[in-house]
Design a protein with these regions (language model features):
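Divalent metal-cofactor coordination and adjacent catalytic microenvironments
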Residues: 1-149
Length: 149
């Protein structure tokens, strides 16, 4: 079983909210808190589907069946914070998107950092997805939008 949990995430840039509102044709500021929540959900959904970071996050990855003592990390990894087995820190090497250890780790905590090219590519999909959420589109439409990632 693999379990990926967001421990901490950066806020979406304020400019993204204004760009989303322009994309969706929303002129007033009365719903900004709702729109910000929708935008945050869209950002997290798109970055999960694309497996690339749009905002900096700290993740905790739990994996109970590691093959070959290598754990694949998700999204745009910038730093491994800790690797633990049965609650104790273990030595590891970090190569590419994988953490290699002498024996199976249970938990890897790591940070991600977005890349400008990923933001440029994925932000239009975020706005499209957020607009669909705002408009109450069905799950089939939402899945179709995410398939563009």
């Amino acid at each position: 079983m693999i379990e990926l949990t967001i421990i901490e995430k950066a806020d979406t840039p304020a400019a993204w909210l204004e760009q989303f509102k322009a994309y969706a044709g929303i002129a007033d500021n009365a719903q900004d808190s709702l729109l910000q929540a929708i935008l945050s959900k869209a950002v997290l959904s798109v970055q999960q589907k694309a497996d690339r970071s749009l905002i900096a996050c700290t993740f905790e990855l739990y994996e109970d069946e590691v093959e070959g003592n290598a754990v694949r990390l998700y999204q745009s990894v910038s730093q491994v914070v800790s690797v633990k087995h049965e609650g104790n820190g273990v030595a590891y090497s970090f190569i590419g998107r994988k953490v290699h250890v002498a024996h199976s780790p249970e938990t890897v905590t790591y940070k991600t950092e977005p890349h400008l090219a990923d933001i440029d590519t994925l932000l239009p999909i975020v706005y499209q997805y957020a607009t669909a959420l705002y408009d109450g589109e069905d799950s089939k439409t939402l899945a179709s939008i995410l398939s563009q990632c």
